[in-house]
Amino acid sequence: MKFVSDLLSVILFFATYTVTKNMIAATAVALVAGVVQAAFLYWKYKKLDTMQWVGLVLIVVFGGATIVLGDSRFIMWKPSVLFWLGALFLWGSHLAGKNGLKASIGREIQLPDAVWAKLTYMWVGFLIFMGIANWFVFTRFESQWVNYKMFGSTALMLVFFIIQGIYLSTCLKKED
């Protein structure tokens, strides 16, 4: 359910763009959906996690700039900025002697610190790659960016999760 909730504004953005072929209208729908979603989550849980706050700020800033200036490049930059901020957070926490990934999901899975470090490197590299890939698509193939955002980046994430799962399964077997 959380996965669908997290993708709600992306799905509405894609649906609106598919019907209207208007990036500004699609951005307006995503902006409203993002704000309503954040308000609902805050009302229900009395808090938003860090990534929800970051996502909200980015959709308001980049979505707002897209709407006010009538320039779709701003909303196209948003995923790259989000990916790069994620990579910066993970790398920065690693350099500070902490593991942001372990802090986020360490309650669900127990791993040695060396494995957490490798996972962090994998995530940092992947997030940098995803930011570059998004930038490449929107600067070279602007008309295809919406399809890439919906399907291409989702497929890349799925492949990354599978690779990560395979890596983790080998690490967990070594521990047994």
Curated annotation (Swiss-Prot):
Organism: Neisseria meningitidis serogroup B (strain ATCC BAA-335 / MC58)
Protein name: Inner membrane-spanning protein YciB
Pfam families assigned to the protein according to its UniProt record, in alphabetical order: IspA (PF04279)
Keywords: Cell inner membrane, Cell membrane, Membrane, Transmembrane, Transmembrane helix
Record-annotated membrane-spanning stretches: 23-43, 50-70, 74-94, 119-139, 150-170
InterPro entries noted in UniProt: YciB
Similarity comment: Belongs to the YciB family.
Primary subcellular site in the record, as a coarse category: membrane
Function: Plays a role in cell envelope biogenesis, maintenance of cell envelope integrity and membrane homeostasis.
Cell compartment(s), UniProt: Cell inner membrane
Membrane-related topology note: Multi-pass membrane protein
Gene Ontology cellular component terms for the protein in this record: plasma membrane
